[in-house]
């Protein structure tokens, strides 16, 4: 098991780690919000999901309303016809969903998937901005570096409780692997 803490589960310790993680995730997702809004006009669902993530990070309860905001942003992603806007909305959805990360699922594929809840806002924001900039990989690299540099200690602690992201062959899986490695490296230096 890749963890330095006992299995966190649904404990107050886990919630204490998830709150600053949600604030970081909201900041990451916010980087791509304009990509969505330029393409999808007045659809406020991703913006509301990011606000919900910030609310949880600032002390609001993890409740049905927050889960509904995440699902609404997910629907916005599915309804968009623009790939960059879809990824931007997914970043927002995952920012709101950070509050529901299962910290007790920390091994194997389940652990990899839970880590993606944490990494997803930055990764999907990076990919949205990369595609919007005509596939400029430097844009994504800059966003991932900023996300790694700004990741609070709580993100590092949570990721150390979960397996590393596999390298993969798709651009998306490569970005997940890259951000995960950057945060883990920064945490040990």
PLM features per residue range, with description:
Residues 2, 150-189:
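Acidic, carboxylate-rich catalytic segments that either coordinate divalent cations
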